[in-house]
């Protein structure tokens, strides 16, 4: 419906989620989350493209009748962006389905580059061209007439976010089975785990606006 209302300008987002919502709020097994997510993605893609009513009999979802109306304007489907922290499985999912991988780098472009270097290696592994439209990353940017005005406008929000919002109990960040062996082998950490690590070890995370800007978290 949104694609029709916008005249074919919808960009769909398929976030994988975090352990806090999927595992602890909804009681899902962390070992099967990725498989269940992939099944859901396939259901949505088929619903967008299949012109007739169909049945879906998956391992986790069974639907007798699936019939999307109104149908998306964009053919064969709207573009899909997958926001993610850092996992090999998310890279593979994006490359197999021609989705855009959007790295959620709360810790700025320097941290994002480390993750995206791994993503481009995965692109090579899949023998696909390094099209720049395959990837993006989150970067907080404050716009103002001057540097001082930007500090005056955004310091309170930035300091609150990095000083308070990213304090995550490490017990919630990585339940057993949530991170796969393949992801651990390449040394990747999600943004949630990274934030929890900072909280647990009381590292010198930037808490002043000046430190936050100097470390590239906010430009």
What are the residue ranges of the model-derived segments?
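Acidic (Asp/Glu)-rich catalytic clusters
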Residues: 3-10, 92-97, 120-130
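Internal, well-ordered domain-core segments that constitute the primary functional module
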Residues: 6, 27, 31-38
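Hydrophobic faces of well-ordered beta-strands that scaffold small-molecule active sites
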Residues: 10-14, 80-83, 101-104, 133-140
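Active-site-proximal loop/turn and secondary-structure-junction residues that shape catalytic pockets
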Residues: 16-20, 86, 107, 141-143
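Acidic/polar active-site rim loop that often engages polyanionic ligands
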Residues: 18-28, 96-97
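An alpha-helical appendage that flanks or caps ligand/catalytic pockets
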Residues: 33-69, 110-219
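A conserved active-site cap/scaffold subdomain adjacent to cofactor or substrate pockets
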Residues: 86-116
């Amino acid at each position: 419906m949104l694609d029709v209302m916008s005249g074919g300008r919808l960009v769909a987002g398929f976030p994988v989620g975090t352990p806090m919502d999927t595992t602890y709020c909804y009681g899902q097994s962390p070992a099967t989350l990725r498989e269940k997510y992939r099944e859901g993605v396939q259901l949505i893609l088929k619903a967008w493209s299949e012109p007739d009513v169909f049945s879906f009999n998956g391992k986790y979802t069974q639907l007798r009748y699936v019939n999307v109306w109104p149908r998306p304007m964009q053919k064969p489907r709207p573009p899909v962006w997958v926001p993610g922290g850092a996992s090999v499985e998310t890279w593979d999912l994006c490359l197999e389905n021609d989705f855009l991988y959007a790295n959620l780098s709360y810790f700025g472009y320097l941290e994002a580059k480390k993750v995206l270097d791994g993503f481009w290696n995965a692109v090579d592994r899949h023998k696909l061209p390094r099209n720049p439209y395959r990837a993006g990353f989150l970067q907080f940017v404050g716009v103002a007439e001057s540097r001082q005005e930007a500090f005056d406008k955004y310091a309170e929000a930035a300091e609150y976010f990095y000083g308070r919002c990213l304090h995550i109990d490490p017990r919630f960040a990585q339940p057993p089975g949530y991170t796969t062996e393949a992801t651990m082998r390449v040394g990747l950490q999600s943004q949630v785990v990274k934030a929890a690590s900072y909280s647990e070890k009381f590292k010198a995370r930037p808490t002043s606006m000046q430190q936050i800007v100097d470390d590239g978290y906010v430009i």
